[in-house]
Amino acid sequence: MFWKRKITKTGGFLNHKKIPKDFLCAAKPQFGLRVIARARFNRAITMVKIGEKITDFELDAFHDGKQKKIKLSDYESKWLVLVFYPADFTFICPTELEELAENYDAFKKAGAEVMSVSTDTVFVHKAWHDNSPAIKKVKFPMLADPTGKLCREFGTYIDEQGLSLRGSFIINKQGILKAIEMNDNSIGRSAKELLRKLLAAKFVSENDGLVCPASWQPGGKTLKPGLGLVGKI
């Protein structure tokens, strides 16, 4: 049986003509409405948004030469930088993670933890870490998301490939998402720019009423929005 039930907790109805043909809805009494869809539609309705609290998660990780369980709630006293990437043993990915590793101390000094995420297993992470000169520098947790569950929640999962897009997410101490960067997989990211965004997000969180202009750096000029500033920039 097909349903036209809107995909929200509050209920309501959705025009069935707007639902893609590859969208299958099945009802189970014990669970309510279950929706199965392609990832491109999933991203539109489930991707976390700026200003929203991130749901706690737990994943296996390769860290300090060991397999560990990592939970978001274990880092409540820190800012968190999540860096999603397509796959181990590839080409752009090791350059990105190497640059993150080289700037890891600066992220920690800013009170943040860095974690990388891909759909590889912990065992593949270990093999990559053992063999790649670039990845041997990595000291931060490398999260394993082989089912793509976390990638789907953050809107980075590519259903047709089983891989993640290049997505970077900055989360504050309260678990609120403050910044997103999403790239095509052919475009590498800058660890220094990610660090700059983290420092800017921290600054405005600690200085109510002030905002950071383009390319702001610590110690640089900030702005205080108000009627007196209108038209003067």
Question: Predicted segments — roles?
Answer:
Residues F2, F13-D60:
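N-terminal targeting signals for export/organelle localization
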Residues R5-I7:
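Intrinsically disordered, glycine-rich low-complexity segments
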Residues C25, I45-I233:
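Chalcogenol-based redox active-site neighborhoods
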